[in-house]
Amino acid sequence: MSLFNTVRNTIVPVHKEGYPFVAAFFVASLILGWIFKPLFWIGMIFTLWCAYFFRDPERVTPQDDDLVISPADGKVSAIQMVTPPAELDLGSEPMLRISVFMNVFNCHVNRAPMRGRIVSINYRSGSFVNAELDKASEDNERNGLVIETKHGQIGVVQIAGLVARRILCWANTNEPMDAGERFGLIRFGSRLDVFLPAGAAPRVSLGQTAIAGETVIAEFASAKGPVISRRS
């Protein structure tokens, strides 16, 4: 393996949504360094942090339609039966909700938890309380996707947080989606909620660290046999 390939495989790519921010921090570092040289190195620290925040590593996603994969990097902050948000139009019956909280040090690229077709995408404005609080699911700005899967419709909700003020979603209604496929990003700390129908059982614990596109957070009763994975 060449040195170039070694370096390329070692460096984690930056998502394109982060390019303007990284460039802005770098230019600011040059300007500050021209004014006072030590400020250049301080600026470069922030530039590197920004690149780290917008990192977009490859993930190896289990390919099994009975498994539910974490849509985000972070900490499992809630596992409970709740009524899904009205805008998702998933009915009034309680569904299993698994929440993953992302702090500013987590990778913030969001991935599909299951394979299926996007039925609807619903944005709702709101406040910006701490995303780790339970009331954030109802009060905060959010963007919800409904995905038709083998086991029925599931909901995936991107929730803005205390610092996060920008939800990005590049998925479209009626598009097919693979498990682990990238569909969005939330800037600077936030939360993802997954709403699952009857038959789903959690496979994570409160406080457990989840990895987007890799960690199995739930499964349906028919899950069996060896699991095949693919890079995403």
From Swiss-Prot:
Site entry (Cleavage (non-hydrolytic)), positions: 189-190
Pyruvic acid (Ser): residues carrying this PTM: 190
Cofactor entry: pyruvate
Post-translational modification: Is synthesized initially as an inactive proenzyme. Formation of the active enzyme involves a self-maturation process in which the active site pyruvoyl group is generated from an internal serine residue via an autocatalytic post-translational modification. Two non-identical subunits are generated from the proenzyme in this reaction, and the pyruvate is formed at the N-terminus of the alpha chain, which is derived from the carboxyl end of the proenzyme.
Name of a matching Pfam family: PS_Dcarbxylase
Localization terms from the record: Cell membrane
UniProt keyword terms in alphabetical order: Cell membrane, Decarboxylase, Lipid biosynthesis, Lipid metabolism, Lyase, Membrane, Phospholipid biosynthesis, Phospholipid metabolism, Pyruvate, Zymogen
Record field: catalytic activity: a 1,2-diacyl-sn-glycero-3-phospho-L-serine + H(+) = a 1,2-diacyl-sn-glycero-3-phosphoethanolamine + CO2
Keyword Membrane: yes
Functional summary from the UniProt entry: Catalyzes the formation of phosphatidylethanolamine (PtdEtn) from phosphatidylserine (PtdSer).
UniProt subunit comment: Heterodimer of a large membrane-associated beta subunit and a small pyruvoyl-containing alpha subunit.
Name recorded for this polypeptide: Phosphatidylserine decarboxylase proenzyme
Species lineage: Bacteria, Pseudomonadati, Pseudomonadota, Alphaproteobacteria, Hyphomicrobiales
